[in-house]
Design a protein with these regions (language model features):
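Non-catalytic beta-strand/loop surface segments
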Residues: 3-67, 86-124, 146, 159-165, ...
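Short, intrinsically disordered, charge-balanced linker/junction segments flanking boundaries
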Residues: 306, 310-318
Length: 318
């Protein structure tokens, strides 16, 4: 292609002056054109997969390595979806579940990242989902209403003056359930024991024993640090006006932020000099027998997920 204006497949990127093109590739296996962009002002990174799939997908994600096991990434994932500047309702997520035409709607906390994915085949619905999620992550009501943190994270409860003080909270109770499952306990122990000197040694979802150690200010500081476009990854997929979506992202949100360095690097674990053994107890019910109720796991680190062929090979084996 020649001339001042280049047409990259489905997009005229020369008109999108707010973005820098980092790479483009035809993805023949999925009949798509792929683009990697960077928003010049904020530093946000965007992956665009343009094709004729009517099921449109959007997500924004942030690297959120936990510094402890208080579950702050998980609590923030819950709480940013409890109202925002543009959508000041108690629970926008529930409203979307009830009234949206979405084909997928969720928010997911991983050991090192938090993502907010949505999908819809309806153009107007898809745009609304994007708007609700972008406003939720960048302008949540958590700074105005401390009770959101207490409701979703943890708080003390006293049913009556003679009752004992108890701890309650959506994430707190969710993780109590997760930590009662032997399979979940083993999965967490594997990750923690293989990478003891990294953020993977901590529980991003929150350990019920440590969740009550999280303060409101620590929680807000985590959001201020990591929920910035400079630390974000945005993904757009499907049959849509990509130029329009990118302009909207720029004008409504990304251009309101300056590029700031965010230290969210995921450090590699130094290899062990010898094999290690870890033993941990887990809870069983009074009806269960301890006999034949033991789990054994042998684990090795074989590389990183950035090695595409190695990663795919082990996905197949799994």
């Amino acid at each position: 292609m020649t001339g001042q204006e280049r047409n990259y497949g489905f997009m005229k990127l020369s008109e999108l002056t707010a973005y820098e093109l980092l790479g483009e590739q035809e993805l023949k296996d999925i009949h798509s054109m792929g683009y990697i962009l960077r928003h010049k002002k904020s530093g946000a990174r965007i992956t665009v997969i343009s094709n004729d799939d009517e099921n449109k997908v959007f997500y924004i994600g942030f690297r959120t390595p936990p510094e402890d096991s208080t579950g702050v990434p998980h609590i923030i994932e819950h709480t940013v979806l409890c109202g925002s500047d543009k959508y000041p309702v108690k629970d926008p997520f529930v409203e979307l579940v009830k009234g949206s035409l979405n084909t997928f709607l969720n928010a997911i906390t991983y050991p090192e990242k938090t993502i907010y994915p949505v999908a819809s085949c309806n153009n107007a619905d898809f745009q609304n989902l994007m708007s609700v999620y972008m406003d939720a992550v960048f302008h949540p009501d958590i700074y105005k209403h401390r009770e959101i943190f207490e409701q979703e994270g943890w708080h003390y409860e006293l049913e009556d003056e003679d009752a004992p003080v108890t701890i309650n909270g959506v994430v707190y109770n969710e993780m109590k359930g997760a930590f009662s499952s032997p399979d979940d306990v083993l999965e967490r122990l594997i990750l923690n024991s293989l990478f003891p000197d990294t953020s993977y040694a901590n529980e991003s979802g929150g350990d019920p024993e440590h969740i009550p150690e999280l303060t409101y200010e620590q929680y807000l500081d985590f959001h201020r640090k990591y929920y910035h476009p400079s630390n974000s990854y945005i993904y757009l997929y499907g049959d849509m006006d990509m130029e329009e979506k990118l302009r909207w992202l720029d004008e409504k949100y990304l251009s309101h932020f300056e590029n700031e360095p965010v230290d969210s690097e995921i450090h590699l674990q130094k290899p062990f000099t010898e094999m290690r053994e870890v033993v941990q107890n887990y809870s069983i019910t009074s009806e269960e027998s301890e006999e034949d109720n033991t789990y054994l796991s042998y684990n090795k680190v074989v590389g990183t997920s950035l090695d595409e062929k190695l990663y795919l090979a082990f996905e197949i084996l799994d």
